Amino acid sequence: MRNRISSFAPLAFAFTITHAAPPSAAPTRFEVSFAAAAHATPLTGRLILILSKTAQAEPRMLVSPQGPAVFGVDLDQLRPAQPAVVDNSAIGYPTSLADLPAGDYYAQAVIDVYTQVHRVDGHTIWVHMNDGRIETFQIAEGNLYSDVQRVHVGTGGTIKLSLTHVMPAQPREEDTEWVKHVSIQSQKLTQFWGRPIYVHATLLLPKGYAEHPNTYYPSVYTLGHGTPFQFSTTPGRNSGTISPITGTESGYDFYQQWITDSMPRLIAVSLEQQTPYFPDSYSVNSANNGPYGDAIVDEVMPALEQQFRIIRKPYARVLEGASTSGWQTLAMMLQHPDFFGGAYVLQPDPIDFRHYQQTNIYADSNAFSIPFGQFMSAERPFRRTTQGQVVWTMRQLSRFEAVLGSHGRSSYQLEAWEAVYGPVGPDGYPRPLWDKLTGKIDHEVAAYMRDHGFDLRDYAQRNWSTLGPKLVGKLHFFAGDMDDFYLNLAVYDFQEMLKSSQNPHYEAEFTFGRPMKGHSWHNWTWAGFARVAGAYVKANTPPGEATDWNY
């Protein structure tokens, strides 16, 4: 899933076409072009046409599985002023243009601009490249977009849109007394992609950091994307409250605790590591994304430990993450058990691919439907409410992603997993785990994912004789019993595997939020976790190691 902090995080209700109005009686086609003033040369990319029923916001800012209707077309060296056609042949979500109810809409078009890259593996591909900072196509620097235009669909004819605007660079946050920003070019990733690739870090410094120039501090890698613990020195509308959904406090309330004398002195670090396929690399080596795992452990973390006074020993490195970051946390702990001292894994993306949410990718033949009896089948859900109401299905999300990009370039969730876990296809792009329109599972891809260690339960079980002794005391799992994305199921699987572990027998710590705790549930406030992490490091500090950070 997307990390806990996201400008375009999914909302709670699915978009459903209601046929109060009949489908378009006459075919409507759109001709979309871009102005030479916006882009002077031919471009390759993905044209996304958005039709919204509301004028409350720009349609491009509403794109999501429960948002407006969207339609996608690939562009191959489209010239300025040359029209690209969006008609009934274009793939659409949640329906085709022909089946869209007739009526008035607010139309806007965006071009996600691609760059040709020559990877070290010999493949030449077209993908959206940036500097490694988190962004989505709606706001990505250099992408083109049109003005919003009110249109009528259903009476035929041609509607023309012109993309005249170029998205500017997003503002960068400035360093403060407490928060520092560092950009590190990875030589390993630069070699893989054939162009400079950066990983960006945001560090939260402890109270007294400047006044103790000879003190080195434990590190907590909170593997989200924003400032660690949502730290903010500015009061907000949620100040003074605890979120009933997450159980966490506001960033300002955390700041008020961070500066107290009772708070452990830690350096908290978050990372930005956007790839062409998703806003996060998952911090592992990948055939499609490149050696992000090696880059982070061998290049990024040592550079941070040198620039900031961070203890350079395993006992003082703690990992914490939720959702995407939860999977990262466990994967990094399993792959580098001698480098990290502990892992707090919250509602991770699937860590047992027998529960790839509700799909067993090894045994099931189709990701979209579950057969029952001789004639019946049910749709596989992707998301639910904490009361069990299904709001998205696998079929819906797969189609949505197919609209946003071909060849795995949607930068959305299902295709993110394929890019991280899966093999490179013959065309140089990620080979799909299943067909996006039929749901048929490719079991060769599933086997590749397992055999290359991305099914973390399978990886841990197969390597337990050497891995287990290095993990004892280090694993802490947390999940809501009604996780929105069914991620608790794979956590249960991992727990069962550990219950049967031998030599060593280690059951780890598992805490489940009950009753009806969803995907964003946390077992503690941010300040509460900082205290837990500090106490954990203190308890596991070897004799003779410096403890002057605990002032």
Give, region by region, the residue ranges found by the protein language model.
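Positively charged n-region of N-terminal signal peptides that target proteins for export
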Residues: 1-4
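Contiguous beta-strand segments within globular domains
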Residues: 26-34, 41-48, 198-202
